[in-house]
Amino acid sequence: MLDTRLNFEKRDFIEYLLFHYQFKSRISVWLLNFIKMNHALIEKIHFVDQIVADHPTLEMAVSDAPVIAIQYHEGETLLMNTDEIFHQVIRHSQQLDVKIHFNHEANRDLRLDHLLLQQLLATQNGDAYHKDMYHIEFSNSTEQQIIHLLKSHIDLSLNLKDIQLFKHYTKILNLIKLRHITDKT
């Protein structure tokens, strides 16, 4: 299995989480370390800001977040604060969303925002994750750079006659533009 740049970004983000945050549950630390070292699992995880209702999701909380320490839900299954979560995740063979609950009073984690953006750019059939775009914070200059990059990718996809990529990058560009429309209303 090839390691993509996105998988490196995910591993780097997990390292960052383990180094900069303390989690409420030891199971969270076990899982993050396991995911980081498991090539098949790192490929299947998708970090999220907004939970997608019908997706299997692992939720973990840092120590000062006002939510439950760890929970896993998939379909009708809901596990909270139990070692069984570890076993469910390591046996998981499909896409798995990972939500990290931070302290709401603290500033947004910019590293999370960076990873969310990288995932949105890399995932062509990730429409379910587009809500995350409305919560990512970036400066005006960063936004302009992203818009410029997206326009370049759109032009390239047109030159290559790649309709899928054209639609994907156009959709992301429109989401960025929509952020400002919703801000004004």
Indicate residue ranges for each PLM-predicted region.
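Short, charge-rich amphipathic alpha-helical segments embedded
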Residues: 167-185
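Short, charge-rich, low-complexity alpha-helical interaction segments
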Residues: 93-141
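Polar/charged low-complexity regulatory segments
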Residues: 1-27, 74-76, 80-111
